[in-house]
């Protein structure tokens, strides 16, 4: 690529342009394929004794063929050597040797057998007499089968004294006996790909491991490779059993800081990142070498990750069971494991001895835990204890037929999903271990990826069993899938605790489940079945109990709206944890602040998580409440492997090595081996020793128990209140009461963190108030009714005077039978400058009856006079509206004839004639005088003159032609039409021309207006235009009214109601009852909203539907009885003839809510509601008067008798047994009527009364009092017939003490009778 030659190399290998003269020789081993392999970084030929004409160089390595004869010089690749240049590599020194091959940046391209070349990158100069080959950055690509050679180390390697090839950065790809790579050697008999093995491929070196196919010659032995962390295989080293190695859990450094093991070449040491688990690809020792030492070495192999340093290019967690699937990229492990402190050596950036404290402390704490077996705890619970995430612990096969076929695939998929979760969690662990900077970087990356993740609804979702496995299951198996888990990477997961039915998603499990049925949102919520229509019942489908785990759930600062991930803020996390525990219907399980993992249990599915974003907000008030609750003892947070070590736990060394841990690891969760089973017998020997004041005397004990200072519930704390002087001590109780009162006011005050607004039934708004004591305030919204006269009671009285009110046929509620309401009545209360005055004035002109000062008996004359009067009023009103517009044009015009025409627009013929005479246009003054005469001859002559001008081609002034057109009586028809004036004048000006100069005698006023509207389109949102349209519609007024109401809001509710009622009662237009009631409902509601209850009640009387009128009037009176019974509005109820029963019932309801039961009964009696009055006496008034009665004066009982006497005799005969009990009881107490009939009536009625109303609190107490009175009367008289009534007396609703006393009296009477006998 950059080294062009005749036989130049390509980027990933050389392309030979010469034809080979010989074929590849047979390999020396049957395992070696006779082909030329090209690796990722160059050609790696393992063909021994091969004659290749053109050995090509790769990108990073060059081909070397030991014992081969090169026919032409080898051309180097991108970083390869050039022949005949004995110079060093990139940083290598020049060697004084006889060889002509130099080291390259990434290795040597040695084509000779015995030569001494310079070292590669970072290698020192070598002056070695023996044959030496140099190591490159990625190792040498040599096939030298010479055991006496010595190769120098690569980038970080040290020279070895053994006859082995030099190690590269990622290991050697050679066939020498022993190779030492940077991360260890892996010399096997099989080929290795970039990330693992690929059987059947050529023996080419991998990216991160060596793939040296060892082919020893005759007489040579094959060396074994070091696979343990120390670079040697101690299973092959003979040593005494007494020389036991140190414990694998002990520190690698002794007291003096020296390593127990000899330092090995760094190339030979394989390290593992934090995300790695137990290595699964460590080779086992040979069976023939089994010994104690070998077994210890096996343990070392299994735990080498916990003692290996965390290097830059340490491989991630290997998964050998995934059929060659690679792990996470190594660069991720490098950047996810930044060191907080790094002290490099002089010659290496890695420590040569010792190990990383982070790797030792946090690599995998599960290996340092003791094995505890508890049958009562499942493996899933233990897994949640360590990581907070669920995992599948067992696989329940749905059918025996697919157990042998699908089990391996299912296990692989399950492990894959779990490993992805573990790798991500371990990356988070490294973030928290390495400090805030790495946490910020990770959060930044997560934030950048969040937008991309949200773009795809199914991005990051996974489930177990996987969708592929589910597709292979039958419908019967899908109906009950156990251990189903579904989640989303970075969001959380759901573990269903019962079998789920997945038959509804057989169309596509991936499309139906991921992001459609199960939705994990970035708002820390999860939703299953977002569509309620498709949501099954509880217990079906996915709507079963489950355990939900949400990730990255942190408290949010209320001010900055940013999550608080600093775990040192214990107070904030405690408050946040308390909020999570108090979530309703989400049974809290655990919360891990390191990672923000929140686990909880739900019984069914809806939207779960932080549904309300304010639940995660933490402010100073929450922290102050936490502090006000008293100083709690500091609790040590139980941390997992994600916990961050403190600075005191870290000891850094300055000699180039990392410090080791000191002390005990606090992050290890200690579990007890067992928990003893306790029974009641275990507590028999334990004596309670309460520190309470007790006494054997019951009286003294009650005094002690009643004392607030010695209460067992009183909190014992020292007095720390303000006590600055003697006044505080003297009035401490008073100060405490004041403080308590302030505290109560503060607690009762509404202090919600959010703003709110709520409408009440009275059309009032309840809002938050930060000033008032209650924290809320009631506000009234502004009404649309802006007409002030509506708020005047005088206007309401005038309206009531103009209507006739009668009772309806089906109910006693009022109805307006006749009305003489006119638009002009409202004009008297309006200001002439208001915007509504012109509208109501026009309506009065068009719709109100016209009155004239004289009478006539001829109907035709009357109609003509009425028409003329209305026409005159209408044109006068229009002139007043267009006057300013025309006057402005007259002032701006200099043409006298044009000014004459403008005067005619104002129907001012006098001024127009005067101007015509002054301007020497006398003929025009004569013609103008005929305007408005409606003479047919004048109209014909004017029309004839216009035709002559048109046919003769005469040039005539347009203003003169306009005047002639007005004389013709059809200004907007025929020749010289004035429709072109539409762009110059308003539509009201043109309408005035039609009304003033049209054929008014031939047509009615409505028809004349309609003819003009047919020629011009009026603006639909102009209320004046709408009124003209309604006036011209005549018979179709209601239809046009509905269309206008649907199209525009030009007419307000009040005007529409007034228009309909005026036209309906005057008989000028016809409106249906439905249209009238619709307008009445709307106007009455608007008046009620404006607190004009009297006006609303008056308008409601216009309703035609009797049932609707009854409901509306009743609701209004019952709700607003207080305002309607006020002194200013009391006459309205009488004038509107509201039923008295409704008024008194409404007042009684008000008294009941206020607790005035006596007034309630009195109002019910006044309203003749005897049934309601009887119920009120039985349940409320009677028991209360009896319980509050003074036995001496009996005033309350006398009041009760007066109330009962107000019932008419016809109603007294209908009394129930319950109210009759009070009447008989009053006779017994007030009148001393103690006859047997009275007592029997009381006893029998008392039982019925009690059984029927015992749910009322006052009734039970009242019956007890009356029963005691009955028993006392009987016992005082010593009635001889008492023996017959003993059973009945004991059935009275007496208390237990009273019944016991009564039984005792009966027993004494029995003993007396026996003694006498």
Swiss-Prot record:
Region annotation Required for autocatalytic cleavage: where it falls in the sequence: 398-523
Extent of the FG repeats: 12-13, 79-80, 106-107
List of residues that carry Phosphothreonine: 751
Biased segments, Polar residues type: 1-16, 428-444
GLFG repeat spans: 39-42, 89-92, 136-139, 154-157, 168-171, 181-184, 193-196, 206-209
Domain (Peptidase S59) ranges: 458-605
Record's GO cellular component terms: chromosome, telomeric region; nuclear membrane; nuclear pore; nuclear pore central transport channel; nuclear pore cytoplasmic filaments; nuclear pore outer ring
Mutagenesis / variant outcome for changing residue 606 to A: Loss of autocatalytic cleavage
Region Disordered, residue ranges: 1-36, 133-165, 249-278, 390-450
Biased composition (Basic and acidic residues): 257-270, 418-427
InterPro entries: Nucleoporin_FG_rpt, Nucleoporin_S59-like, Nup98_auto-Pept-S59_dom, Nup98_auto-Pept-S59_dom_sf, Nup98_C
Pfam families in the record: Nucleoporin2, Nucleoporin_FG, Nup96
Compositionally biased tracts (Low complexity): 17-30, 139-164
Origin superkingdom: Eukaryota
Assigned EC number: 3.4.21.-
Gene3D superfamilies (alphabetical): 1.25.40.690, 6.20.50.170, Peptidase S59, nucleoporin
Any single GO BP term: regulation of nucleocytoplasmic transport
Its job: Functions as a component of the nuclear pore complex (NPC). NPC components, collectively referred to as nucleoporins (NUPs), can play the role of both NPC structural components and of docking or interaction partners for transiently associated nuclear transport factors. Active directional transport is assured by both, a Phe-Gly (FG) repeat affinity gradient for these transport factors across the NPC and a transport cofactor concentration gradient across the nuclear envelope (GSP1 and GSP2 GTPases associated predominantly with GTP in the nucleus, with GDP in the cytoplasm).
Domain notes: Contains FG repeats. FG repeats are interaction sites for karyopherins (importins, exportins) and form probably an affinity gradient, guiding the transport proteins unidirectionally with their cargo through the NPC. FG repeat regions are highly flexible and lack ordered secondary structure. The overall conservation of FG repeats regarding exact sequence, spacing, and repeat unit length is limited.
Anything else known: Present with 4630 molecules/cell in log phase SD medium.
The family this protein is said to belong to: Belongs to the nucleoporin GLFG family.
Quaternary data: Component of the nuclear pore complex (NPC). NPC constitutes the exclusive means of nucleocytoplasmic transport. NPCs allow the passive diffusion of ions and small molecules and the active, nuclear transport receptor-mediated bidirectional transport of macromolecules such as proteins, RNAs, ribonucleoparticles (RNPs), and ribosomal subunits across the nuclear envelope. Due to its 8-fold rotational symmetry, all subunits are present with 8 copies or multiples thereof.
Protein name: Nucleoporin NUP145
Naturally occurring in which organism (per UniProt): Saccharomyces cerevisiae (strain ATCC 204508 / S288c) (Baker's yeast)
